[in-house]
Amino acid sequence: MSEGEQLHLDKLFERLLKARKIFKNKEVLRHSYTPKDLPHRHEQIEALAQILVPVLKGETPSNIFVYGKTGTGKTVTVKFVTEELKKVSQKYNIPVEVIYINCEIVDTHYRVLANIVNHFKDETGIEVPLVGWPTDEVYAKLKQVIDMKERFVIIVLDEIDKLVKKSGDEVLYSLTRINTELKRAKVSVIGISNDLKFKEYLDPRVLSSLSEEEVVFPPYDANQLKDILTQRAEEAFYPGVLEEGVIPLCAALAAREHGDARKALDLLRVAGEIAEREGASKVTEKHVWRAQEKIEQDMMEEVIKTLPLQSKVLLYAIVLLDENGDLPANTGEVYSVYRELCEYLDLEPLTQRRISDLINELDMLGIINAKVVSKGRYGRTKEIRLNVTPYKIRNVFRYDYAIQPLLTVSLKGGQRRLL
């Protein structure tokens, strides 16, 4: 490296720092940020506050079930209200503990109980390992640490449907009945879900206990999303860096996806990041469209990355057919290549009927298009095409050790046999 090149690199960060600043505080646009005011959620704030106010009178509040689609403000509103409750409770010398658990990550009965116990470890000196103890022993410790003094403990289970679908409702049964086993403390549960249907998985006794009170969050419309983005933008960006059409466009695009405020915030943040990296003086509508494309690509890559192994092998069979010029293909043609790939990996193949189900799942995820077409007297068949480029799929699979061995495989030209 020459001296001039080294000097250029040394000055790199200084040069980037001196570029036109777009963001004043980017964190304001993150999902984890709790603003001082929540536009268009005052009705839900009031409802939650009415249910929780008994705490300030020394009474046990009802359990609450909160539901609504993704990006409707459920989590941020619950955090906002419980933080306000904690502030006011301190004024009245009423001990309140709020324990927030994301059940997409903490998704087993054992881990939920362990997280609650470990919330109090600084106070109690008791810590439960994330694996290894009998569950009933962890539950006994939970009761012990909670009941060490008089207090109200509010347990927020976010994405509660993920927990129930994976591990059943036993933990909910325990937590919604724990007050009968406590002498000093009182526990209330707030369950948050994107999926109302998950209640079908619950034992009727658990459902009646959890759903003592319900608060519904409807989707935002485009105008409401504009208000939310305008409020956040004032804190997030320097004055004058957003072109006039940027916020309305972000709001309109997010409103198309069931009024998802998270999507709207992501669009605005990523558009700002793209403008900043380009050294642009303003964030424009073009930056928003590019942000939309990037977010969709990132989401699709994440979907492909988290597919089960059999679905990945099936998808790679479709990739090979595409690269061989054999798409659209029917289910039988795809299945033939899929079986060969399974043999190559020493993997037990699924039945053609099950593969037909997986093709439908890939279609629903938007990774492929599986259109049923009529062949006249030959009946109906599926025509399968890719919606994602083979390059992008291969790029995701490059980092997947289970599927990596297939990346050197191709089909013989004009034949559907592996090379």
UniProtKB/Swiss-Prot annotation:
Matches recorded under InterPro entries: AAA+_ATPase (IPR003593), AAA_22 (IPR049945), Cdc6_C (IPR015163), Cdc6_lid (IPR055237), ORC1/CDC6 (IPR050311), Orc1/Cdc6_arc (IPR014277), P-loop_NTPase (IPR027417), WH-like_DNA-bd_sf (IPR036388)
Q: Answer whether the UniProt record assigns the keyword Nucleotide-binding to this protein.
A: yes
The answer to whether keyword Ligase applies is no
Which terms are listed as keywords in the entry? ATP-binding, DNA replication, DNA-binding, Nucleotide-binding
Q: Name one Pfam family in it.
A: Cdc6_lid
Q: Which domain of life is it from?
A: Archaea
Gene Ontology molecular function:
ATP binding; ATP hydrolysis activity; DNA binding
SUPFAM superfamilies in the record:
P-loop containing nucleoside triphosphate hydrolases, Winged helix' DNA-binding domain
Provide the residue positions that the database annotates as binding ATP: T72, G73, K74, T75, V76, Y220, R232
One GO term (biological process) = DNA replication
Belongs to which family? Belongs to the CDC6/cdc18 family.
List the HAMAP family hit by this protein, alphabetically.
ORC1_type_DNA_replic_protein (MF_01407)
Q: What does this protein do?
A: Involved in regulation of DNA replication. Binds specifically to the oriC region.
Q: Please report the name of this protein according to its UniProt entry.
A: ORC1-type DNA replication protein
- Give the organism the record lists: Pyrococcus abyssi (strain GE5 / Orsay)
